[in-house]
Amino acid sequence: INPISWTNDDLPQLGGDTPLETCLVEGTEIGYVGFELGNKFPKDPAELKAKLAGYGAVVVSGWHSGNLAEGTLEDEIKAVDAHMKKLVFNGCKVMVYGEVAGSVQGQQQVPLSRRPRFTTMAQWEDYAKKLDAFGAYLKSNGITLAYHHHMGAYCESTQDLDTLMKLTTDNVGLLFDT
């Protein structure tokens, strides 16, 4: 389960005062044993493992705010290193990738119509190539990339998502976000 059920990382005014312990107690009481990471979880891999073990829980995924739409593959690999190692240390097999480059997510004064967009197939192909290579890198480290399309980002609409998935291989999975 994702801690967004209790506390929202994007809009801290929604549950920002809810302690992590409340999420863990209530989540495990209703039968969940796996949690996606949020901002309230310990950053240190060993502290994270110990915290979750205290509730009989494990890490099942961790969000990564990616910038491949406007950055390089090499920079993204450097940026993800500590997070990926934390997931691997904790036995986690899935990383949720959300593209945040140029995103208007969280900017409530900016209309969603001003979100970034790829306007040519060449831009889509370049992005898909980098994302696919990033997914291959994660896979070589035992992690599956689960792509999270998102409101206010480059990949938002059904058409965007269809285009992206057609241009990538099984190195890029799709997150079912309910």
Task: Locate predicted features.
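Active-site acidic/histidine proton-transfer and metal-coordination neighborhood
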Residues: 73-176
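Hydrophobic faces of well-ordered beta-strands that scaffold small-molecule active sites
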Residues: 1-4, 35-37, 59-64, 95-97, ...
